Amino acid sequence: MLRREWHRKGLLQQTPFFHRPLKERHTLKTCESQTACEDSNTGGWKCSQENCVSLWSIGEFGNLDSDGGFEGDHQLLCDIRHHGDVMDLQFFDQERIVAASSTGCVTVFLHHPNNQTLSVSQQWPTAHYHTGPGSPSYSSAPCTGIVCDNPEIVTVGEDGRINLFRVDHKEAVRTIDNADSSTLHAVTFLRTPEIVTVNSIGQLKIWDFRQQGSEPCQILSLTGDRVPLHCVDRHPDQQHVVATGGQDGMLSIWDVRQGTMPVSLLKAHEAEMWEVHFHPSNPDHLFTCSEDGSLWHWDASTNAPEKSSLFHQGGRSTFLSHSSNQASVHLSLVSSWLSTDPAKDRIEITSLLPSRTLSVNSLDVLGPCLVCGTDAESIYVTRQLFS
Amino acid sequence: MEELDCEPAVTWIPGVNSKKKQMCFDWGPGEMLLCETSFNKTDKSEKVPSCPFIYIIRKDVDVYSQILRKLFNESHGIFVGLQRLEEELSGKSRKAQLVRVSKNYRSVIRACMEEMHQVAIAAKDPASGRQFSSQVSILSAMELIWNLCEILFIEVAPAGPLLLHLLDWVRLHVCEVDSLSADVLGSDHPSKHESFWNLVTVLVLQGRLDEARQMLSKEADASPSSAGMCRVLGDLMRTMPILSPGNTQTLTELELKWQHWREECERHLQDNTFAANPHLESLCKIMLGDEATLLEQKELMSNWYHFLVTRLLYSNPTVKPTDLHLYAQSSLDMFLGGESSPEPLDNILMAAFEFDIHQVIKECSIALSNWWFVAHLTDLLDHCRLLQSHNLYFGSNMREFLLLEYASGLFAHHSLWQLGVDYFDYCPELGRVSLELHIERIPLNTEQKALKVLRICEQRQMTEQVGSICKILAMKAVRNNRLGSALSWSIRAKDAAFATLVSDRFLRDYCERGCFSDLDLIDNLGPAMMLSDRLTFLGKYREFHRLYGEKRFGDAASLLLSLMTSQIAPRSFWMTLLTDALPLLEQKQVIFSAEQTYELMRCLEDLASRRPECGEPDAQRLQDDDIETTKVEMLRLALARNLARAIIREGSLEGS
């Protein structure tokens, strides 16, 4: 069932769904109207001259034909040139989009729904930069991750710097230089004003903007071999639960309240995990994508077996048990991601993409919709995640 | 060396003054750099300002087309699927699968063509509109050739079905009839439409007899005078025997029926059944395969291969594949009638009708502006086992040669290079070497890209390339003062020499600033510390500081001493270590034992005695020496005092 919804090439007469800019990263947002129409936003990944940030509409819910297929209701609304590769892309609010560039620039684009155009509303050209003997003043450093929480924007970069911007301020509100000795790969809010960053030596650092100085308030790390972490996401309801994905494709679940090591390590992809996302309204579901070209749906809600049977139709369906290295007992409100009883708790994994060739760089999920962008320069959309 | 098949094309580069003959150039992967030199050979005194530009000449411009990028991306998926299919395919399903793959390729070409067409229509300035239109016609020609190759080489249709395939081929590519049909049927009186008879004729020419009959019935309704004739001709159309896919009749039966039908047509013509209506008479002649009548409809057929297929349909419907080229050649000659010479497309199609695959590929390579078409077609035909015997006098076989050319073109592109990797993977002979050469030359502007490149190398055990990429990244990080990053990269590459270099930088920074940077990394080195002695020293020295900070003086002292005695610490750093020992020596309780103190003294004397003799003393030097001497004196004093305390303490402990 799931596979059929993937919007993709067909035989002779069908026009394949293609996408113009490269290596998309995107987020979803709900529109103002409560008709739950969705826009997916995509951006280019690669070199200078041809990148752009494009805004797509992927149509409304509920108008699928009898076959469950969709034809032609995704549509390019507008695009705008972007200097450098788009390293990360987030919706700031209903009409503003924040893009991180490989040139170290952070740009806020404003969408004008009336005439369907995008314009630059705010820009911090040198948010990330290197200072070194080789460069007279500074040389740009790629900005690798951003996270927005109106009105604040936090950015991290290869220069190990953390910036806190306010959308209406030209200058950074707070900058932590040398926050990390290695590259910071991703950032997310833990609970305002705390953020979590992951870096290329397998550490998870928690920062509190109320504290001065350039020291994190907590460092958690994977054991031993310093496998780089590439992505991080926080449980939408339980703010102490954090998921990260690493270079070896492992999914780690952390409880930041206790311990310095992950609660569970789950063997997942065969190569770098580029992005991990909890489902925003259904956090027992988690989605990951990887360099090996796979996109996985993790379902930890299998306490109700009759419900889980809905997911069996997908391709790969495996049961994994937690490998726990910490005996924590939470009697009340135990998150299904933290429970450590291997006999009882199982996570069901479904592979959402049929053929695996090139890397899936980015994904986002909202409601029953999931969007991902791949190195084959295409976007996949499914609108029936839970059917 | 073979002779050149055609003169290489001359590319004019606007802005270059070729008369001055001061060009220099350099090949890059898939592109060439060209610039004017500043050397002036006639007289050196007068410097003519040379052109300040460097020109980049790209071989595969099509790679940079936005729309064609989709062609490359989609066909990459099909290509990889085909290579994987190879392992599991056998026997009968094999052909069906290969035909399916071929159709997938064609569907991608078609999709691109449609999109390009839309863009061409929407284009605002006529120049770019023309450019897109010409791309559309190139894509359309590609699809035409591919389709024919699919019928002849992959499907290998036998006599009978062959003609049905060819008919489909012509119908697919000469498709103006559909719009004409809509136009005519949309009018109030279809049969009075000026193009009505053109439409009927085209339908008959394409063998769409059912539709032609419906048209005739409209004519019959409109003009009762010709109703009888229309009915007779309609019956002829209805009764024409054709091979239907599900039918079990043999070719001989079909031929027999067909002869009967033909005789009936001829009889009507001789009886002058249609004499009153020249249109109907001409249609009947067409159905008899009358060449003169067919050639009168040149305009409606628009090209010779349409003529060929129509001619075969009405004169030899069970044509054998082997006879095809005879008909093709004569059709071409008749159609052109000596008025014009065949174009490249005609030659390619002719070569296909002659079943000369190599000629098809060769002509396509010359005529088309990119390698996409020939590379994929050759690969597919190779999977049909049609190219085994052919070896080139250079490189390996033709399939591999073309794939390599195509993949090299992709590698020049900033984003499509990833597709090229898979093509190289499926070139058994030279693919690996080519990949190694190309992958090292990819510009690494972000770490994410670097990680992707590294993953590709690691999957293929290309250790040398992994090393060199990590080194590039480490070097870059050092240049940007990102020592932590640099160290991480050299650890990943297991590059001991570079790790030593970075560790030295760390130690130097420490000496200058008195504190360590990047503690999060150094404190977590773990087993990676063993990569180089200097790195081990760095880690251990930092450990010493931590122990000291935690006031574990005993452990700190023995660690410090072992760093010197085990020769891990570089000699240049000994003085710093000894200075670090000073506060430990001055603590209230005795930390260094007598034996340890002796060791320290030996180290100090060792260091002092080996001090290099300096050449010319200058003021700075003297001052430095002064500080050094003071330090040594202080150390000696502290050591002596500590030794005394240690001996007393040890003596009294033993005594008690």
From Swiss-Prot, chain B:
GO terms for biological process: chemotaxis; lamellipodium assembly; macrophage chemotaxis; mRNA export from nucleus; nephron development; positive regulation of DNA-templated transcription; protein import into nucleus. Keywords: Acetylation, Centromere, Chromosome, Cytoplasm, Cytoskeleton, Kinetochore, Membrane, mRNA transport, Nuclear pore complex, Nucleus, Phosphoprotein, Protein transport, Translocation, Transport. One of its GO terms (molecular function) is structural constituent of nuclear pore. The modification Phosphoserine is found at S223. The modification N6-acetyllysine is found at K92. The keyword Cell membrane does not apply. The modification N-acetylmethionine is found at M1. One of its GO terms (cellular component) is nuclear pore outer ring. It holds the Pfam family Nucleopor_Nup85. InterPro entries: Nucleoporin_Nup85 (IPR011502). Essential component of the nuclear pore complex (NPC) that seems to be required for NPC assembly and maintenance. As part of the NPC Nup107-160 subcomplex plays a role in RNA export and in tethering NUP96/Nup98 and NUP153 to the nucleus. The Nup107-160 complex seems to be required for spindle assembly during mitosis. NUP85 is required for membrane clustering of CCL2-activated CCR2. Seems to be involved in CCR2-mediated chemotaxis of monocytes and may link activated CCR2 to the phosphatidyl-inositol 3-kinase-Rac-lammellipodium protrusion cascade. Involved in nephrogenesis. PANTHER family: FROUNT PROTEIN-RELATED, NUCLEAR PORE COMPLEX PROTEIN NUP85. Component of the nuclear pore complex (NPC). Component of the NPC Nup107-160 subcomplex, consisting of at least NUP107, NUP98/Nup96, NUP160, NUP133, NUP85, NUP37, NUP43 and SEC13. Interacts with NUP160, NUP133 and SEC13. Interacts with NUP37, NUP107 and NUP43. Interacts with CCR2. This is Nuclear pore complex protein Nup85. It comes from Rattus norvegicus (Rat). The gene is Nup85.
